[in-house]
């Protein structure tokens, strides 16, 4: 077997990232903070249950920050249900509990389902913590199940690239 194609280092890297991701993404206090939204314009359609923010959209909630060209929030009475952000790229960051380093991510589209707490980074997706990096065309993070999937495991079409810096685990 060609040592450059040996599956164990890739499997180990994916396992390490999967094990560290729930800790990296868990932000216990952010969901209880108020949401602040700034944009060039907003269109609220109560009949459809959507709010569409366009132009230099900035959303902040606790340590969470989302920057996008366009954000569509789908909601039921009084409660957001789903957030779809798009940009070139759309960006987010959040500060994990017990950490000084932000988790950051970029993708052409970010989709967050509030009920299931699933975040999907779609199109040139990248997830970072410190110098560790996770790249694929699609990354799915399920906060409830504490599972990260990328590439084929996340119904993506490209391979996954994981970079883990030594001495950070």
What is each of the regions a protein language model found here?
Residues 1-169:
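Mature-chain termini and adjacent capping regions
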